[in-house]
Amino acid sequence: MGRLSLRRPDPQAVWSLKSDKKLWNKADAWYHRSKSGGGKWEYLNKKLPERWTINYRNLTFNIKPMGFKHTGLFPEQAVNWDWFSELIKKADRPIRVLNLFAYTGGATVAALEAGAEVVHVDASKGMVTWAKENVVIDRDLGDRP
């Protein structure tokens, strides 16, 4: 994620490993899943910061490895951010977005950056706080509706 690499095995990834194992072994951190649920991160790079930022196009996000192998972002959603950002930019009218189960705000940030008014909703106060941080990091979106 960004300049750092994280190894996060997933039980849903049932296909064979196609990449060079040497590359996987260079990961800065490795998530080990527990058979009883959850798991823990093993930090192989002792200089790995607790939190860092990554960029996708003109968007910047805070990343922090958490339990259950979460990092604060679902990068596979970037294709969706691109899609609706273009729709928002091409609209001939103001766009209002209701982002439910919004997590740390990847979609919220993308929609705001595209010019939409966004209501961000998540049940976790911590995730809403993180989303607010993502909204204001490296951009002037904090005063947008």
Model-derived segments and their meaning:
Residues 126-145:
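S-adenosyl-L-methionine
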Residues 1-2:
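Non-catalytic nucleic-acid substrate-recognition regions in nucleic-acid-modifying enzymes
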Residues 75-92:
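Conserved alpha-helix/loop element of class I SAM-dependent methyltransferases that forms part
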Residues 104-116:
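Conserved SAM-binding loop of SAM-dependent methyltransferases across substrates and taxa
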Residues 117-122:
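Conserved SAM-binding motif I beta-strand of class I
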